[in-house]
Amino acid sequence: MDARDIIRRPIITEASMAQTERKRYVFEVDTRATKPEIKKAIEEIFEVKVSGLNTANVRGKKKRQGRYVGYTRKLKKATVTLSKDSKDIQIFNEG
């Protein structure tokens, strides 16, 4: 898998933005990606050094349309901790 296929998008919420002060960033990643693949992709795309990585599989929520029941898609979140000497990831500092 290519690095740009592994990292889907940053997750920008109030909680994730509070963690950026401690050099922790949250991304939505491909559900099939492993921790070593995610670490390599982050280091390759953003040119930083990753010191820690946590992942969480999030189930899809149940949604209804009348009597029909379906689910939203499941996703995997990766919380990346950068080393002290790494630069910040710029997409989180805009706005």
From Swiss-Prot:
Keyword Lyase: no
BP GO terms, sorted: translation
InterPro entries: Nucleotide-bd_a/b_plait_sf, Ribosomal_uL23-like, Ribosomal_uL23/eL15/eS24_sf, Ribosomal_uL23_CS
Example of a GO MF term: rRNA binding
Gene3D superfamilies: 3.30.70.330
Domain of life: Bacteria
PANTHER family: 60S RIBOSOMAL PROTEIN L23A
Subunit structure, as described in the record: Part of the 50S ribosomal subunit. Contacts protein L29, and trigger factor when it is bound to the ribosome.
Family from the record: Belongs to the universal ribosomal protein uL23 family.
Family matches, as HAMAP family: Ribosomal_uL23_B (MF_01369_B)
Name listed for the protein in its UniProt record: Large ribosomal subunit protein uL23
Organism the protein comes from: Leuconostoc mesenteroides subsp. mesenteroides (strain ATCC 8293 / DSM 20343 / BCRC 11652 / CCM 1803 / JCM 6124 / NCDO 523 / NBRC 100496 / NCIMB 8023 / NCTC 12954 / NRRL B-1118 / 37Y)
